[in-house]
Swiss-Prot record:
GO molecular function annotation: ATP binding; ATP hydrolysis activity
PANTHER family assigned to the protein according to its UniProt record, in alphabetical order: TWITCHING MOTILITY PROTEIN PILT (PTHR30486), TYPE IV PILUS RETRACTATION ATPASE PILT (PTHR30486:SF6)
Family statement drawn from the similarity comment of this UniProt entry: Belongs to the GSP E family.
Protein name: Uncharacterized protein YggR
Keyword ATP-binding in annotation: yes
Positions contributing to ATP binding: G127, A128, T129, G130, S131, G132, K133, S134
InterPro entries membership: AAA+_ATPase, P-loop_NTPase, PilT/PilU, T2SS/T4SS_dom, T4SS_GSP_E_ATPase
Record keywords, A-Z: ATP-binding, Nucleotide-binding, Transport
SUPFAM superfamilies linked to this entry: P-loop containing nucleoside triphosphate hydrolases
GO terms under cellular component: cytosol
Amino acid sequence: MNMEEIVALSVKHNVSDLHLCSAWPARWRIRGRMEAAPFDTPDVEELLREWLDDDQRAILLENGQLDFAVSLAENQRLRGSAFAQRHGISLALRLLPSHCPQLEQLGAPTVLPELLKSENGLILVTGATGSGKSTTLAAMVGYLNQHADAHILTLEDPVEYLYASQRCLIQQREIGLHCMTFASGLRAALREDPDVILLGELRDSETIRLALTAAETGHLVLATLHTRGAAQAVERLVDSFPAQEKDPVRNQLAGSLRAVLSQKLEVDKQEGRVALFELLINTPAVGNLIREGKTHQLPHVIQTGQQVGMITFQQSYQHRVGEGRL
């Protein structure tokens, strides 16, 4: 089977990830579980020669690893991670939906579109690896593209979803290809007149600092973070800084944060996967807790904040049960 046929078969079986190893049979992940794939492993190095340019191949050779994305036939796009291991080169491939999903299709909290109308501030999407953060960010961009007149600038590693400008002008930059780092790209973005900045990941204190500055100075910043809950996201941001900087960062975050959307995926009754959400909205009470370093109280605030649109994972689970999905 060629790669296009393998991907078509994977889509048919609701595969989320493909694992192609030079020395072992191919495997794929379905509903979160690894299984043997019913095809022979293609020549990984031949695939990389076809997919990567000279600069990317040089990076892979020098660093022993490379993140990239590639488009195949019929609008199918893959996010790839190539890495060297003791038997040769391996590929981990994430299948991306061929079309940008809508927030309603994801079952995202109904207050989210209202939050996206903010003219400035920081909205975080958090969760474990493979929890669908990139898909949710793509749905947010898709919503803005249909409902707002704005300039959206994305910084991604790699570029995953491809957007066609509709009401919005959308410009996508890839780390390592169009700019060297998230921090350098974000620093440049402040001079490129964006209304909305999408950051694929808040990786370090410099990027976090620049993101908070952008959020304070008239930009809506959408970004992801690898944490399993909203309160942990706030703690993670603050803990990225040395002790003497934590209080100023708390003050900055208390003023600029708009919301934290955390998510995870569960296997549903239809043998698919369904997203559960936790949403923290930065009300005056939440801002005070962040400013005072009392993030341990945020879970209780979320639990009692339904009247303003907040939701816990447990409440999201019960909603999915009511829908018949779980």
